[in-house]
Regions:
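Membrane-embedded alpha-helical signal segments
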Residues: 1-238
Length: 240
């Protein structure tokens, strides 16, 4: 970035939330010579639209889409597909799991691993949410690869031990109601996470919030309402 001011329209980049300036095309050379990175309007729009699709992928995928993925997998693993869908898991349940994965930025490219894991699980009385949580450890590698380049450290955000223990106790006490935070605590929590996430994002990196598996689902549901691009991972998925 440049500290030299150039004339244009001050805006916030819609994709990354960073300060930017719309300039006329004839000012490109001037902007570049003073240290600005210039991006073509088409690229800005394409990036913005792709991020919108990415954020809403869970709403867009349906049973026909999942069936197409299964048909592709059937070409290389026909017995696996036939033995799991729909004998063990109905198509609508698998679609629900895929939606939850996409909502939380978990890659669904390794459908073979998903079915292999499902084939060995006792799914009695398991909800779609329970299935997705049980499958996450087998997809942790893909998720981490998406967040951090190979051989690069994964930037993580964690809670203090005192706060995490308090949240775990709150989840245990609330039972089926889920985690309910009072406004003051929720605001303080979200503000701190936004600041930490923005600091890491300013370095061009993607952060992961790492918490106890006992509260991962509940924390993710709360945090994603305010910070769309953060990934909430259970500590058991991180191998130290």
């Amino acid at each position: 970035s440049s500290k030299i001011k150039i004339s244009g329209i001050d805006v916030i980049d819609p994709s990354f939330g960073m300060e930017a300036i719309w300039i006329e095309s004839h000012k490109q050379a001037e902007a570049e010579s003073t240290g600005y990175m210039v991006v073509e309007p088409e690229s800005v729009l394409a990036t913005h639209f792709s991020r919108i699709l990415f954020r809403n992928a869970g709403k867009l995928i349906g049973q026909d889409d999942v069936q197409s993925l299964l048909d592709n997998l059937s070409e290389s693993a026909p017995q696996l597909v036939q033995s799991v869908i729909p004998k063990i898991v109905p198509l609508h349940s698998l679609t629900g799991v895929m939606r939850l994965f996409l909502d939380e930025r978990v890659p669904i490219s390794d459908l073979r691993q998903v079915l292999e894991t499902l084939s060995g699980m006792n799914l009695t009385n398991m909800s779609i949410q329970d299935m997705s949580e049980a499958l996450r450890p087998d997809l942790a590698g893909l998720l981490i690869q998406r967040l951090a380049p190979l051989n690069e450290p994964l930037p993580v955000i964690t809670f203090s031990s005192g706060l995490e223990h308090m949240l775990i106790n709150m989840v245990r006490q609330s039972g089926e109601e889920g985690l309910v935070l009072d406004n003051a605590l929720a605001q303080k929590l979200i503000t701190s996470l936004v600041q930490a996430n923005e600091k890491i994002g300013a370095e061009g990196k993607q952060a992961a919030l790492v918490v106890s598996p006992a509260i991962r689902r509940q924390i993710s549901a709360i945090v994603r309402q305010h910070i769309e691009d953060i990934v909430v991972m259970g500590l058991s998925l991180i191998h130290i």
